[in-house]
Amino acid sequence: MSSQTPESLLPRHEAFLRRAEVDRPLLGAWIGGYYPAEQFPLGHRSWQVGQLLQPADARLDAFRNDYETLYRVHREAEDDFFYVGSAYWGVPWLEAILGCAVHVGETSCWAEVSRLDPRDSSRLCFDLRDNAWFQCLIRFTQDLLQFAAGRFPVCPPLLRGPGDAACALCGPEAVAMALIDGKPWVNELLARCAQVRLEVLERLHAVIPAWRGTHAIGGYACRLWTARTVAYYQEDSAAVLNPKLFADHLLPLARLTRPLADIHFIHLHSSCLYLIDALLADDAFSVIEVNLDHPGSSPPLAQYVPALRHIQQAGRPLLLWGEIGPSDWDLLQEELSPIGLSVQPIIKLPEDIRRYRWRRDNRDRG
């Protein structure tokens, strides 16, 4: 952002969503590292690795200096964005609200599989007003809004999809096999997880105001900003399913959140790119975001560039987030169009964003 005002940046963001003619992609620096603890070292280190996290432990106070640093360094980057904050995204908030024990890890926190009796999801029927983790989330969000004082937008934290939540409750193998075998209990469980997620988002939207008359999402990996309302969706459990199971069981639940916002975007890992055709055949998500995952945890970028081009050629805005080395950056410029493209590289220092300059001879590739 640097010297630019947010108001001067908005037209380029809207051009991305419209897939209007542009000379370069929408560029957003993600400063601080791939993992939550890398962005929030002081706050995360206030806990002990292995600690069983309690709602009283997750408070803004320990994270204040981290948020201030993130706000400052994102202002220094010469890009098209600014800092967007949310309650610490290293906490698996939805899983905690649903009753999973949360433990502190080296780079983030993780939810322990609760081994819920799959035939009884009745314990997921509760009043959020009586849920300690939900109240913790609301308090953290309200405290962050007060701390931000209008300097940066605040959004809901990462809330994984109902498939991810069900896997946290019962284990991914149990959920996948139940879907394959057509067990009725798994759809009841997924529906209840989806309903709780929806209720949490509705309550958060009620306490989070618009920012300068606009809306932003992305206090975690990748960001989106628009004059319209916007919501984020993640369903990493799709990695253990197939296109039909996803389309039949998880995609209908994703549509339940449509009344929450005008613009919806979904996060995908390279292991979930088989979903692209199902997503392009549906209008649930206006934008598709793809993680450029760590080498070794995903195929080389060259192997899935055709899938990225397929998204662009279908007329869907594409958002890319991850660690992008020089050779991958050259490949993206050769193969993709800047039209309807947002690139958000992970960098260590604000000045590193200068490495991501776009050649202006490939606008017709999309």
Predicted regions and their residues:
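Active-site loop segments of alpha/beta catalytic cores
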Residues: M1-L52, D66, L70, E76-A87, ...
